[in-house]
């Protein structure tokens, strides 16, 4: 229900309803105050005759809340194809300078608009208080030339701060110390940015990744040779040189960022990466990175209050991966990821929703609901290596479908010095889930698996603790089967099926 401030004496007008836990209101007036009345309705079937052959739905109001909000002023819109920018959307012309000039000229609360067409570009840098809007048919296409992603920037990959190639879109500057200051709100390098529309943001994908790995392997050949057998601690020989790859969108020390409605695809590794950020909201987006190594979709990393909903994933790795640093550096930086919310998301291919394996700074207060990850490889997974240290706790997953639930130690990405202790995994609840016990691999083949696998760490005191499963169903829909369960090195695990 909705009414504007100038309708103060009027009744609220019903504008829509939803069976989801989100709703988008469109076509509002600029610079206008609105009141929004939200009602939660519970529907029950009531029998009309004794044998129950006829029934009627009765609606029962269970909760309501009124929200007051004020829309922004109408933005100044800069079309990148207009003079003096004159960007060309022919899929051939390199438009980096033209688009960056439009971004630099964008005033506070202004909008840079990408019209229909394919606009080739290298790395771009956004600033505070702006919007990047992609019209229907617009493609912001990153090149596959590594030179177009220079200079390198200070970033973090797989839990370690390091210099990486600039991403296609770059927001903020990395500053871990800023998150520890009493006035940390004033330390954010980039605030109040929207990236939205109906178009596509794409990078150079696998070709760009392979070119960067080849170049960096040559740069590091002496160092890699000096590692000897230690290189076996890495996932593969290319792991170390691959860590300099750019993301599709890199946010460092950012606050109040919205990504909405766009297709995000073909980053050279992770697509959306938030490092030391606060309040990043992503909704209505489609992620595609199938066939790309480390092709994660959405990765909050030592960040606060990040939310994603109403998104679809077809990825070469995790759909969502919640992180907080690796081994001693992650322990010392000591910035946990907190307050993550994931709901109404669907996976058509990829690994699903994971926490870790880089979780040395801690992960807590995560809620996941209304998600369909049936086509994922892992489903829902909490993972870490024995070297990590840190903790994962207060994780709540409900009203969703997964092939399986995993909480365990893993052996990959295990290079580097160990942290001071093994990780702690505890205080997790899983309610009203369907676990199919069947997962889909990267070649779209299906395999049986344990529906629940819990395996704590081998050091005494680091068992998985305080985990509760309730209202769990096993098997494909309309085909309930016994789910295989594996539990090792755990304490206080309860199950109610």
Residue ranges and their predicted role:
Residues 1-497:
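Extracellular/periplasmic carbohydrate-active domains that bind, remodel
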